[in-house]
């Protein structure tokens, strides 16, 4: 049965800001929340599992999904394709479950256009220095790739004000608390319209 109270939450962030960790922690706290698993053409990392972290597909398979209109949103990030399956999201919402998407700002813009009632949340690092530290501590990318990720991250962060809420991920537990409050409808202190939030974010941006 369709439940009009079911909401769609969109979480976006620059690479290294910690959105994956935050969303996974939130889903543990709120098992009724449905996490939409994205399609990607990216190569699977050693710590990732098919159907758990991503749905890994070929470039041709992704092109077919996109051409058929099976994707609610799609974006090209670091030479790889990412997208959210439309049917999966629609079914969860129809079943009355809140759904959370973990995507980038490009995809978030598409979802806001397709689903104007969605709640959008942008995750920021506490500083650009901390962002660089997090990217380097992964030990998965070359210096050239890290420099590119940092450059793209700064560009991504310029879109923060397009979102309904902003969370500074300087303390994991507090950031998860903020994310949970937003899902519960009590996240006013994180609203991007709030002057204190805007001042804090502007101090982070270069």
Where are these regions (language model features)?
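Post-Walker A helix-loop "phosphate-sensing" segment adjacent to the P-loop in P-loop NTPases
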Residues: 27-36
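Conserved phosphate-donor/acceptor-positioning beta-strand/loop module used by diverse small-molecule
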Residues: 99-104, 113-138, 168-169
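ATP-dependent small-molecule kinase phosphotransfer cores
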Residues: 38-99, 105-109
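Extreme N-terminal, non-catalytic leader segments
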Residues: 1-8, 31
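P-loop (Walker A) phosphate-binding loop of NTP-binding proteins
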Residues: 12-14
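Conserved lysine of the Walker
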Residues: 19
């Amino acid at each position: 049965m369709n439940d009009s109270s079911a909401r769609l939450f969109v979480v976006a962030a620059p690479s290294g800001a910690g959105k994956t960790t935050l969303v996974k922690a939130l889903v543990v706290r709120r098992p009724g929340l449905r996490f939409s698993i994205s399609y990607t053409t990216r190569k699977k990392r050693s710590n990732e599992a098919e159907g758990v972290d991503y749905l890994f597909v070929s470039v041709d398979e992704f092109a077919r999904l996109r051409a058929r209109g099976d994707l609610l949103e799609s974006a090209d990030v670091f030479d790889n394709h990412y997208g959210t399956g439309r049917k999966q999201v629609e079914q969860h919402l129809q079943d009355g479950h809140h759904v959370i998407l973990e995507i980038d700002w490009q995809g978030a813009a598409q979802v806001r256009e397709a689903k104007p009632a969605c709640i959008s949340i942008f995750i920021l690092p506490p500083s650009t220095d901390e962002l660089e530290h997090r990217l380097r501590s992964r030990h998965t990318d070359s210096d050239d790739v890290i420099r590119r990720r940092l450059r793209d991250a700064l560009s991504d962060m310029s879109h923060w004000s397009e979102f309904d809420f902003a969370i500074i991920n300087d303390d994991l537990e507090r950031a998860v608390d903020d994310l949970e409050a937003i899902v519960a409808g009590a996240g006013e202190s994180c609203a991007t319209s709030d002057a204190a939030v805007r001042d804090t974010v502007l101090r982070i941006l270069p």
